């Protein structure tokens, strides 16, 4: 199943440590983004893949072309000649998606055996296109 998450792609932030209690927690911005991804999956009619099955995930992160780019550079971005080599790092983008879909698209992210993650420029606002599928043995 494929679904879209509107808004600029974000990466998984490092866990934070509480000085007072000594506990580890996920930053609020990351937790909110994970919730947004999970809601988009469920709103698209997503159903969990059984725990005895393998999962494949494709994540395409689309970033808005900066307004400061020249006409030539914007055109190169539109034709995928220039790609967004910028933050967030691709591994952090993938990690936030995998964690968000835990217990929603699959029981545990250990079921994920195939991944693809790419960064592109978008002619409009930024978004994520995520595809989750069962991988046959």
Each PLM stretch: what is its role?
Residues 1-137:
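Acidic, proline/glycine-enriched N-terminal capping motif
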């Amino acid at each position: 199943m494929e679904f879209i998450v509107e808004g600029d792609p974000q990466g998984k932030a490092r866990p934070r440590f509480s000085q007072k209690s000594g506990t580890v927690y996920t930053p609020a911005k990351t937790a909110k983004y994970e919730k947004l991804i999970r809601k988009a999956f469920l709103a698209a009619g997503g159903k969990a893949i059984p725990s005895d099955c393998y999962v494949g995930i494709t994540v395409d992160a689309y970033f808005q072309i900066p307004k400061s780019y020249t006409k030539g550079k914007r055109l190169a971005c539109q034709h995928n000649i220039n790609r967004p080599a910028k933050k967030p790092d691709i591994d952090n983008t993938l990690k936030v998606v995998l964690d968000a879909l835990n217990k929603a698209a699959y029981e545990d992210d250990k079921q994920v055996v195939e991944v693809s993650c790419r960064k592109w420029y978008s002619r409009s606002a930024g978004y994520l296109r995520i595809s989750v599928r069962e991988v046959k043995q």
